[in-house]
């Protein structure tokens, strides 16, 4: 019996031993598992944990610190990510396993692919026999991996005639050669700082950078190449050196500053958010430089290669040629842009000029403005505070905002009334004097107008004399439903598809016109109505184009043809009636824009003054407007002009001679 039990025990032990052996073999660390774990640690940048996967022989050859430093410098230096391997073969050699595999990884120059092999030793699990050629097959322990970057040329921004609005220019780089400073280094540094408008601490910080030697040229600040007096003073200080450097340059400077925008060195936050840049890259900060950044910036050229201990190029791992940025040609006429800026530069205002036949935007002027060439060079904190705290907001692109249109809205009221058949050109209203209210339900609320005139109170005469009372009554006759649906059709409360962001025009704060008094005020361009200047230019183009609103655009097209933004924005008859009436605003001796007459040129236009106040009793600034277009001309122009603080300068009549000179040139 005991013998039987012993035999059974022995059999069980044998079975258990066999089972344990097979379980051990099944769950034993496989060499390919170690390789895959190693690659996973590379992707996770866990260099210390990579080191733990090395065999003892490798650890004796390289310390953990040196291993981490070498791998980290190489992988981070080439901007490696997403390494993947495909095992091709596993060869046994005693306790060793030799794995051949194909590796792929993303790097700053693109994808790097190579075949390689790795040897693993079974040391209580498979461990890696490591050397530098595990990083790249051709890499020896004394070699280095280098990354060479070639910067592309940033694309130019050109006007319609090919003139550069933004391109490459030169400036003067002010620097210091430390070994050539005089013995009175502190005194000289303070003097340099004072002349450059910076702190001595900022200079010393640059001089203390790790790469600086006595013979190094240490750039301190870039200034305009024309700063000859400043440069002469600086060169009198020992150790100062001035070199020429390339910069982004803007030929129109202030005249197109909000339009072109400007570039500056990328910030840390921008570098984290955007791909394809380095810490020294320039990036568009505002305007078209920002809008077209992806097209203008180009693509860096990158070469990643192995260099031997003698500094010789040994193997190119990947090479990507640089791609220069795209040149972008605009519809802008730089001469017109400059002329209009010169007219308005001392005021707070804007001009939008468009070809009403094609939609080409010929000028976008906003005043006052900053010198974008100074922004590229860099401004001091005091200079920046002066700009950002300026009450006249010189960085604001006024043409992108929305404003009360005043009487320039009256043609739109007329156009909606005629198009909806809720108003006819022959309709007349009965009232006398310069003040009117519908009835006693309005209480003390009255509509006022500036000028009494003889003749019928009809649409044409009301436009000629800019009669507020007529258009208030016309709006009431049109009705809230027709008015709001007509304005919705004109794309109020919508984003206008344009190259730059534009504020949405509105007819009220809540998207409704419910009160009679608000509807009446809306009729003559007051109330809560706010219109974007580019949008109103597009609306006025419908009076030129028999009712079709033309889409404005900024990027030049050969053989320009119009894109209709709103078909039949007004009926053909309505558009032609308004156009003919606006011609009389200029041609009629009593017209509010009679000063705009130019011999041989037919012009349709409308003056406007918008009151910026919340009640009739309040006194506040006004906005002056003048919107006009040439009729039946070979090269038609449509102008929208606005000036703030119009009660100080004559408003729309201040703008008329400016536009007149621009058309006559």
Where are the regions that the model predicts?
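Short hydrophobic alpha-helical segments used for membrane anchoring or interfacial signaling
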Residues: 351-356
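Short, gly/Ser/Thr-rich active-site loops of penicillin-recognizing serine hydrolases
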Residues: 38, 562, 656-665
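N-terminal Sec-pathway targeting helices
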Residues: 1-14, 19-22
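Beta-lactam-recognizing serine transpeptidase/beta-lactamase-like catalytic domain environment
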Residues: 308-317, 357-407, 412-643, 651
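Solvent-exposed, acidic/flexible segments
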Residues: 28-32, 43-44, 60-64, 94-96, ...
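Extracytoplasmic/periplasmic proteins that interact with beta-lactams or build/remodel peptidoglycan
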Residues: 70-350, 370-394
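Second-shell loop/turn segments in exported
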Residues: 22-25, 36-37, 53-58, 104-106, ...
